[in-house]
Amino acid sequence: MTRIVGHTRAILTIGDKMKIGYACTLALQDDTKMRSCIAKNASELRLIELIDHNLTALSNILTYNHQQGIKMFRISSDIIPFGSSPINSVDWQTLFQSAFTFLQEQIKRYDMRVSMHPGQYTIINSPNPEVVQRAIVDLQYHCALLDLLCEDATHKMVLHVGGVYGDKQEAMKRFMAEYRELDETIKRRLIIENDDRYYTLEDVLWIAEKIQIPVVFDNLHHKLNPSLTNLNEKQCLALVKQTWKSVDGRMKMHYSEQDPLKRAGAHASSIE
């Protein structure tokens, strides 16, 4: 039996028939492990070797998921090492075109829905323009990768709103202003998530109404950073569903449970 690990959270679509998936990696499956390197070892040859390995690993993951009836999967941002950094000057989109074509065919054939989640430093509401510019470059990388793998806009990039910087309302306004300036190819894939510290479900729903962006509901984040306390989770999901249009596909949610032995927000290794 293969144990699924990653961010130890389930990724769900809600509808007449629920689909379930997971984030990033498999345990006990050596041919699915991603590889990377440190910056000083990131020669062009080494990066090409790593990208080739990682794309093969992704193909193996997709095959495994299909065999297990798993229809959703979050792809690791590290699949292209230093993908949004000038350290990586490899023209990987062209060099690996045939591999991406094969992966796209797999995703279509398996009826798989994939996603990505740019990291904690991808912050478009920062008051620092350099931070915002780096975030935009990172979003461009994630979007380019998804565009090579998936044609339609149902395959999403999940983003947190970002920091508060001493004035939450102004930070929310900056997020909306920066979002409006993003390229349409990025906006068609972006969805925002309630986080466990700063931005509640109520906050992201307010933003979603203003800029017409889908919301993904994270149940554990909602428990740690609650809002709309007069509503149960089913009622919260009904509000979230209203942010999704047909072009976005079926509504998604993130489901995980607290590890009782670790800090608040640490995911349990399984879901009951």
Set out the residue ranges of the language-model regions.
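Short acidic, Gly/Ser-rich segments with clustered Asp/Glu that frequently serve as metal-coordination loops
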Residues: 199, 222-224
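A general structural motif
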Residues: 170-175, 236
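Fold-independent oxyanion-binding glycine-rich loops
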Residues: 25, 162, 195
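Short, positively charged low-complexity motifs
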Residues: 1-12
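Domain-core and long-helix interface of multi-subunit machines
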Residues: 169, 192-198
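Alpha/beta catalytic barrel-like cores
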Residues: 14-113, 120-136, 140-151, 156, ...
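Glycine-rich phosphate-binding "P-loop"
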Residues: 156-171
